[in-house]
Structure formats: C-alpha cells, structure tokens
C-alpha cells in the first residue's frame, strides 16, 4: 500500500511539473516519436495529428512518357535507395511521367509528409495573395497585418524578409534539442500563439537565416490579408486547378486552434506533390491556364540575400545546370531542372545529413541518376 501511494504521489508530481513548465508538447512528442520507435519526426507521423483536408477537383493522372519505366536499373543506386529507405522516386520529363518507382511497401496512393516543401507551397500562396490584391507587394511591412509583432526591429520587417529568410527573427532551427522552439512548433496545440511571442531582434534584410518561424509568420499575414484559411485558399487557387489525383492533408496544431503548420507538414502522394514542380517548371502555367503570375515564379528562383535561396526555393548549379529545389526533412525533394524540362521527386525516411543547412549530397545522387536515365 505504501509503495502504491508513493508511485501515485510521484506520478502526480511529474504531471504537475509538466503542466507548470508547459511541457505538454514534450509528452506528445515522446508519444508520437519515441514510443513509435523513431528518434525524429517521420513521413508517416501525420496519422497522429489533426489534419485539414485539401480538396481536389476533376482529378487526372500524369501523361505517361513514351519510354515510361523503360530503363536499366543501376544496382548501386538501388542499394543507395535501400540504405536511405526511399519510398518513392519519380522522374518527369516534358510534363510526362518517365520513371515511377516505389519501395518498402509504399505505392502511388501512399501519402507522406513533405515537411519543408510546404515552405515552397506557402510561397505560391503568398504570390497569389499579392496577385489578388490582398497584399500590396513583397515590400509591405508585416506589422500592417500583425500589429502585435514583437522585438526591436518589429516595425522594419517586410514580407520579403520573411519569404527570403532574412527577417532577423530570434529562432533556433535545431531539431536535435527537444526543448528548442522548433520542437515546440511541431507539437504545441496553439502554434500561432507560440509564434507571435517570438521577437525580431536583428536588422532585417541583411543576413540569410533559415527559420521555420518566418514561414509561420508569413501564413498569419496571408490569412489576415485574405480572410481565408491557408488550406482553403490553396485548394481553390491551386490544388483543384492542378487536377490533383487525391485530396491532400495539411497538418494542424489542433482542431481547436485550427492553425496549419505552414512551415511543414503538407501531406500528399509523390505524384501529386510533383505537380508543384510542374507549376514552377512552366512558370505558373498549368496546361494552358495561368494559375500565378510568371514574374513571381521567375523571381522566386533567383538568389536573394543568399546565393542558395530564393523565395521558398533552394538554388544551386550542378554540372552547368541551374537547379531549383524544394526540400524537406529526411530528404523529401522536388527538384526542377528547367534546361532539361525535368522534375525529380524523391520521398523517404533518411538522407545524408551533414549537420549543415545547405543542400545535401544525396540530392545530387538523385539528380545524377535522372541524368543517366535521360542520356541512355
């Protein structure tokens, strides 16, 4: 009886501390991640969160390339995919599906978390909000939409500063620390309350500093400007018009708060997320219908404060080819090579993490394989 009483008291103390220290998010993280055998968030974790449905309309499949799946496999590449636990690898040339391969039990109907590819999607939504007149320009001040903005430089931050990751926001993007702000953003039940408490402490527009907080602030701007939820606005202006084969999901902090995790967590099939690549490759045109101004797309894939980042897109030059890339945690990629009219999509559970924010080596391995197949 005494032992049982002590156990109850200990549990009561633990839970009291959890609530007193606002660590409910930490408990949720342990339950979702560690108790499922993972050490970080993963591509199937959306099943443990509330999600907003992104409705499609008039779904259509990709046109198949005349050489669809007609290629000789490279054993070393297949071994690499096994090592990286790839779930899907697609190559699209001239808007036609050339290569489609799935691994580890995944198939063309499997939905997975694209993580920070969502940042590119939100950039599209931003461009549309500007085009529709809800936002004057990229140079408009953020404080006009969020008067409660905090920090020494709150009055100086422009929308472009958020979009190009140069806002001066106080932020720690490290996913290794379970008590960091980025860990909290993934598991808290009121994300925007947390975000709005983060201050802008450095001069904006001067230095590239990749931050999920920038994207979440941007989503608040867009929702206040348009009067619509991010998911609804994206569905109406893009997902339905791109004839996605499936409804998608966008992870929420909770149904009660209703805030999409704009910095991450757009969930779809590999073939459907590739449609974002097609829209960029064709400068905002979708099969003859313009979904967004071409000038915004062109501006998005030009280097800004950093030579590796535009507006929601990563940039590099490889083997003489200019490349724009959408990237997400654990190696989610939609890679665009305009000169080759090429889109490469890869989803999976691992990547070659070098601890840096720059483009990682594994993405070039997927590019090399696509170029090899095209040349043969």
Q: In which residue ranges do the predicted regions lie?
A:
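N-terminal leader/targeting segments and the immediately adjacent pre-domain N-terminus
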Residues: 2-106, 135, 201, 368-376
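Short, small/polar residue-rich loop motifs at catalytic or cofactor-binding pockets
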Residues: 83-86, 110, 329-330
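Flexible glycine/proline-enriched surface loops and loop-helix/loop-strand junctions
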Residues: 107, 177, 199-204, 214-216, ...
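Active-site helix/loop module of the DD-peptidase/beta-lactamase fold
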Residues: 132-170, 197-199, 224-263, 268
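Active-site-proximal alpha-helical segments within enzyme catalytic domains
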Residues: 214-221, 262-285, 332-348
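Active-site Gly/Thr loop motif
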Residues: 245-246, 251, 297-345, 353
């Amino acid at each position: 009886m005494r032992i049982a009483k002590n156990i109850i008291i200990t549990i009561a103390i633990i839970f009291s501390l959890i609530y007193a220290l606002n660590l409910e998010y930490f408990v949720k993280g342990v339950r979702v991640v560690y108790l499922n055998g993972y050490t970080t968030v993963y591509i199937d974790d959306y099943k443990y969160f509330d999600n907003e449905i992104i409705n499609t309309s008039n779904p259509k499949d990709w046109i198949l390339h005349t050489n669809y799946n007609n290629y000789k496999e490279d054993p070393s590449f297949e071994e690499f995919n096994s090592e990286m636990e790839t779930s899907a690898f697609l190559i699209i040339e001239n808007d036609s599906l050339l290569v489609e391969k799935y691994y580890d039990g995944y198939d063309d109907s499997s939905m997975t978390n694209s993580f920070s590819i969502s940042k590119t999607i939100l950039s599209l939504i931003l461009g549309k909000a500007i085009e529709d007149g809800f936002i004057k320009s990229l140079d408009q001040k953020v404080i006009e939409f969020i008067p409660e903005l905090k920090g020494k430089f709150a009055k100086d931050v422009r929308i472009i500063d958020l979009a190009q990751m140069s806002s001066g926001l106080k932020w720690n993007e490290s996913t290794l620390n379970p008590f960091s702000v980025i860990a909290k953003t993934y598991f808290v039940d009121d994300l925007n309350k947390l975000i709005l408490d983060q201050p802008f402490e450095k001069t904006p527009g001067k230095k590239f500093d990749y931050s999920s907080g920038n994207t979440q602030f941007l989503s608040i701007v867009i929702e206040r400007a348009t009067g619509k939820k991010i998911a609804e606005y994206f569905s109406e202006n893009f997902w339905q018009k791109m004839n996605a084969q499936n409804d998608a999901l966008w992870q929420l902090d909770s149904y009660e708060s209703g805030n999409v995790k704009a910095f991450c967590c757009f969930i779809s099939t590999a073939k459907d997320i590739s449609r974002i690549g097609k829209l960029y490759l064709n400068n905002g045109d979708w099969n003859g219908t313009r979904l967004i101004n071409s000038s915004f797309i062109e501006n998005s894939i030009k280097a800004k404060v950093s030579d590796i980042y535009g507006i929601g897109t990563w940039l590099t030059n490889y083997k003489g080819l200019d490349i724009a890339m959408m990237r997400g945690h654990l190696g989610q990629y939609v890679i665009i090579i305009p000169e080759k009219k090429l889109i490469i999509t890869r989803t999976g559970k691992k990547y070659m993490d070098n601890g840096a924010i720059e483009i990682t080596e594994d993405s070039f391995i997927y590019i090399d394989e696509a170029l090899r197949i095209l040349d043969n």
